[in-house]
Amino acid sequence: MLNPIVRKFQYGQHTVTLETGMMARQATAAVMVSMDDTAVFVTVVGAKNAKPGQSFFPLTVNYQERTYAAGRFPGGFFRREGRPSEGETLISRLIDRPIRPLFPEGFLNEVQVIATVVSVNPQVNPDIVAMIGASAALSLSGIPFSGPIGAARVGYLNDQYVLNPTTDELKESRLDLVVAGTEGAVLMVESEADLLSEDQMLGAVVFGHDQQQVVIENINALVAEAGKPKWDWHAPEVNVSLEQRVQALSEARLGDAYRITEKQERYAQVDVIKADVEAALLAEDETLNAGEIQEILGNVEKNVVRSRVLAGEPRIDGREKDMIRGLDVRTGVLPRTHGSALFTRGETQALVTATLGTERDAQTIDELTGERTDRFLLHYNFPPYSVGETGMVGSPKRREIGHGRLAKRGVLAVMPKASEFPYTVRVVSEITESNGSSSMASVCGASLALMDAGVPIKSAVAGIAMGLVKEGDNFVVLSDILGDEDHLGDMDFKVAGSREGITALQMDIKIEGITREIMQVALNQAKGARLHILGVMEQAISTPRGDISEFAPRIHTIKISTDKIKDVIGKGGSVIRALTEETGTTIEIEDDGTVKIASTDGEKAKHAIRRIEEITAEIEVGRVYQGKVTRIVDFGAFVAIGGGKEGLVHISQIADKRVEKVTDYLQMGQEVPVKVLEVDRQGRVRLSIKEATAPTQEAAAPSSEE
């Protein structure tokens, strides 16, 4: 029979429930986690044995949202969920990052975590719930895992930190920070902020880590009650004699290779050394495993780099720990784009463009809680040539989506409001060279391209990636890390911001024991680096250009009465469609009567404004208009007097004498002066030609149909 085991606890303003033993009993472990009506069902399945020849840890995390969770149908023709959305991909990465370092080294069994959102309260974001569920399921499974972890979202409202703010609170918050960690250490931080100080950001990380201890305590209690036995897994035995032999053959040569500052040359030399060592050892003993030799070589390589850094020696490319690579900053590099920049930092380079569009260019995002529109898009592309390789080119991968989102977080806080700058903005970062921190190069390039495009951003922003090498109590924080330093180090710490404060912080830690002191040193060192980069960027362009590109659409805004909106749109959109075709502009009308006319040609925009003013103008009784005959009937003629308005000239109002046949006096398309006699309650207009042509009449008002 089903035997659910439940833990319930208070977590900030929410009640969290952990339940296991009820569903998916054939999975290695399964947990239903709910937080005030938002429920995520998380399963873990682990393979008992690693595949032969497996050389990496095959962990996959899939986060998936079901529309039934919000009582909705999926969009699209098939009315079924399809490939993961960008939001689902980002949350999958958010779950993956803090759990991956907690699996033991040498554990190569396949593990799959699937988190399915099955119920959603619009005020409670499912991401934290899913992270708690993944932690609980892995802890229950018996799979070798040094957890559990806790997860918390931290907001900053009225100068106070808020634990797990609601969706409404988050809209007003100056901070959106997610922190995850074990009982003793922070492992992951992902955040965007409205120009907060280093101390405020560090305080938020510590606050979130302190508050999430209640999650860890309750997961441990659930494991004590319902956990499966720990797997009898042991790390593969180390071949000490082979390690010593590999070290003797390679250590000195790898040390020399890592004094080569040029990346491609260094990589080529390292590859030669590894091939030589492998060949020499296999010549001595054919029974040795080539994969094992390469793994040991990787460890020797790691130790060579780390020991040099800890000893205070120059880094791989000859820099000191807090030095930034050489910078080259250029703007306006592409002639027909609306804004462009080329940002180069050492061997990392980003070509970044900014494109301005109208509101209809905004992205409509179909989320669980409904649709929303995004007026600022930032896309990051990482082609294989950027690292001198060949590879598949196609739709963006998880890494590209994640890096693009981080760069967007870095720029978002300085973007102007829609009321100040009514454009949709798309920034694209093409990584043309990469050797560390291409996402932060994208932040710098985006800031430059936006300024070049004339987007009135509040201030320039720059980003920097920090690294860490730590052995015992000895640690060194590195500024502007290379790709190798990221791979061989203990921390990847990315900070973006302006001179005023931080806009984005992302931290991934591979080891336990990162203290508040280390984070403080990293943040302060990052500030110095950020200010240095901003100084160089400001030499290229210090303020946004005074005008947008001649190739960008210019948006003109006018206001009309809300009861005139229907007149401008017309039946089935006929009037606005005709206006768009006639004037060659893009016209958007909002519910409050705001009309936006976009065109690259100023004269066309003015023409469209004139036409809209004519359409929305009130018809004055007694005024003479120049009109055009549109229909002839037995009892008179209908005459258009502009603005899509039409009136009837009765047969008795055509001439001073008796008219037997209307066509004797009027033809289709003929232009005639008409005087407005009356507008009745239903808006019908009565016109007269004979009164308009009387000698006493003033000159006719021009027709909009001319």
UniProtKB/Swiss-Prot annotation:
Q: What is its EC number?
A: 2.7.7.8
Q: Which UniProt keywords apply?
A: Cytoplasm, Magnesium, Metal-binding, Nucleotidyltransferase, RNA-binding, Transferase
Concerning InterPro entries, the annotation shows: ExoRNase_PH_dom1, ExoRNase_PH_dom2, ExoRNase_PH_dom2_sf, KH_dom, KH_dom_type_1, KH_dom_type_1_sf, NA-bd_OB-fold, PNPase
The organism's place on the tree of life at top rank = Bacteria
Which coenzymes or cofactors are required?
Mg(2+)
Q: Does the keyword Metal-binding apply?
A: yes
Gene3D superfamilies for this protein: GHMP Kinase, N-terminal domain (3.30.230.70), K Homology domain, type 1 (3.30.1370.10), Nucleic acid-binding proteins (2.40.50.140)
Per UniProt, subunit arrangement is:
Component of the RNA degradosome, which is a multiprotein complex involved in RNA processing and mRNA degradation.
Looking at the UniProt entry, the stretches that span the membrane are none
Q: Which reaction does it catalyse?
A: RNA(n+1) + phosphate = RNA(n) + a ribonucleoside 5'-diphosphate
Cellular localisation: Cytoplasm
Q: Disulfide pairs?
A: none
Q: Is Transferase there in the keyword field?
A: yes
User: To which protein family does this belong?
Assistant: Belongs to the polyribonucleotide nucleotidyltransferase family.
PROSITE patterns, A to Z: KH_TYPE_1, S1
Q: Which residues form the S1 motif domain?
A: 622-690
Task: Indicate which residues the UniProt annotation says bind Mg(2+).
Answer: D486, D492
Q: What is this protein called?
A: Polyribonucleotide nucleotidyltransferase
| NCBIfam families linked to this entry | polynuc_phos, PRK11824.1
Q: Which Pfam families match?
A: KH_1, PNPase, RNase_PH, RNase_PH_C, S1
Q: Name one GO cellular component term.
A: cytosol
A GO biological process held by the record: RNA processing
Name one molecular function that GO assigns to this entry.
Answer: RNA binding
